[in-house]
Amino acid sequence: MVMDDLFQRMVSCVLPSWRAFIDEEVKKPYFQALLEKLKALKATIIPKPELIFRVFSFFKPIDTKVIIFGQDPYPSPNDACGLAFASNNSKTPASLKRIILRLEKEYPSLKQESSWQQNFLLNWAEQGVLLLNGILTTTVFIRNAHKNWGWEEFNCNLLTFLKNQNIKPLLVFLGVQTKNFVVKSIGNVDGFEHLSYPHPSPLSGNLFLTNPNDLFKTINNWLKQHNQKIINWAVVKNASFDQLS
């Protein structure tokens, strides 16, 4: 199969171990239809093609510890970067700002002066945290524009791909809508343990910040119970991390 320019740009950063999965998906009718819809768009695709599969550029499938699901990318071209909740913008999006506040509440040692680098979440991505949007693209300035375009089937097949290799990371759903979207639209979550937590958006009120149950510590406790190395949740690499704080 001759790959078109759009697909080549999409997979330009993908690690070979993930390419094995994606190269099988691109042969399927649903993915060919998805590519045609993306190519037919007159408006800008968010994120840009080179970043759509960026989530698959940091570690091998076998090293996937946790999947934190978002719904779809930030619709602003200055924010979307291919990682759910992360941003390339120097201004921290509201949801990410609350994620950082929650993190500092659970780990006071991580409290630091604001830095534009905190928005990237690269330290998480480099430790086996798959920051995965249920829908990987949208149209500039329009939320949820590519629902039912095929990304749901892609992510359903992704979970099958992991499960078939006996890779069963913890699935983390932030918000009821995200959980319902993943369970109903993507499906195939049987066999995976999962954790549900309020959404960090200000539209959800203060539930994310005031929830008495820990989020990040719960994830690390799960990893310890499964004999895996815990995540250093520092949002900026090399920041001090005291797991007991």
UniProtKB/Swiss-Prot annotation:
EC number(s) per entry: 3.2.2.27
MF terms in GO: uracil DNA N-glycosylase activity
Active site: 72
Keyword list, A-Z: Cytoplasm, DNA damage, DNA repair, Hydrolase
Gene Ontology terms: cellular component: cytoplasm
Presence of the UniProt keyword Lyase in the record: no
GO biological process terms on file: base-excision repair, AP site formation via deaminated base removal
Residue ranges crossing the lipid bilayer per the database entry: none
Principal cellular location given in the protein's record: cytoplasm
Listed name of the protein: Uracil-DNA glycosylase
Organism for this UniProt entry: Mycoplasma genitalium (strain ATCC 33530 / DSM 19775 / NCTC 10195 / G37)
